[in-house]
Amino acid sequence: MEGLTFANGASWNLHMIYSDQIATDHCTIRSDGVWNGDGWDPDSATNCTLFACEFFTGDDAVAIKSGKNPEGNLINRPTKHIRVFDCHSGFGHGICIGSEMSGGVEDVKIWDCDMAMSTSGLEVKATKKRGGYVRNVEVRDCTLSHVMVHAVGYNDDGIGAPVPPVLEDFRYERVTLLGRYIDHDHVWHTCPAIELKGFDLPSHEVRNIHFKDVVLEDNRGPEQNILMQDCLNVSFENVTVRPGVQPG
């Protein structure tokens, strides 16, 4: 899919399920005002590449998925080998992995993206019932409103998996995190630049996360720029904190 404009689908605009070798480039996706209006959603799909695209979405610009419990656990078809680069959010929720990730997600690489104008920046989210895993995610050379890797309590319906999800092995390098986000009414708010929150069970912490050459904008004070709970093996290397810009 090249050079196309997709607009105002009833829900997700591009949904690639059980697919392989899908490339999308130089497209514009618009769904501002559409509830659950995701842009580009690989779902139990492999070897999908997205680049040089512009997003104005009512929900996630990109949502990487692999099925929802219990069907996703039973089918057990992971999403892997996803590449996203040179993409820009004009409005929307940014890039997300989950929360429908019951079949597992692995080997995701994201670079040269601008998700400053977004609600969630770059978010990895899972509920306790989902099961599955997200692992081996690399992000570099991006500007993001903020970063979240966290357990969430909403959309926690359906028969639960035997064990909670595993969230592990993330690397963020040369990223700028603004510590502020824009909501659905186009109003800016401050927020932690980094939020890491695992599940409160042994072996289900968020683990093995490395930040290197990161710039944080200080909008909330030093004790609120980074929030961590139920985490294991988190490291920071060469982090620069600069004065933030208060939302107007």
PLM ranges: what are they?
Residues 1-248:
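Extracellular/periplasmic carbohydrate-active domains that bind, remodel
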